[in-house]
Amino acid sequence: MADLRANPDELLKAIKTEERGGYTGHLKIFFGYAAGVGKTYAMLKAAHAAKHRGIDVVVGYIERHSRPETMALLSSLEVLPPREVTHEGMAVPEFDLEGALKRKPQLILVDELAHTDAEDSRHVKRDQDIQELLRAGIDVYTTVNVQHIESRVDVVGKIIRT
């Protein structure tokens, strides 16, 4: 016979959501001292663990750098197609915020928190894209290097108050 009792964790989550006027996503930052130290790899490993727990995980944007380990981890995750923008005559992939909001996964991976978005983007900086995802109730995993922190102190403050 099925257990018809309510799950206390789900009840508590519903109460908190109602009290806050809606669920705000959680942010997890994979922090490193420089490029190539394994932030994206660690983020992808954590995403696989979340997927294994039944979380709806989508890759919003990953800077691939053609690393075989990164490519292998990407192969078993859903990857949203990037927006193609033209920069100095070249096609450049950009994170598709609109596509991510439309897809509305439980968890989205968006590499490079300190990235400056293309001119025709909704926001100037990727951290603003991430803030919008969080407000939409989507959990976000992202990466950042230490050299970007000093210049983004104000943004980090805004994100942790979201």
Residue ranges and their predicted role:
Residues 1-30:
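Extreme N-terminal, non-catalytic leader segments
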Residues 11-14, 88-94, 159-162:
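Short gly/ser/thr-rich secondary-structure transition/capping motifs
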Residues 24-102:
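Conserved P-loop
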Residues 56, 104-107, 133-142:
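Loop/turn-to-beta-strand initiation segments
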Residues 63-68, 114-115, 140, 146-151:
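Conserved nucleotide-binding/hydrolysis micro-motifs of P-loop NTPases
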Residues 112-127, 151-154:
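Conserved ATPase-coupling elements of RecA-like P-loop NTPase cores
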Residues 148-162:
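Conserved phosphate-handling catalytic cores of large alpha/beta enzymes
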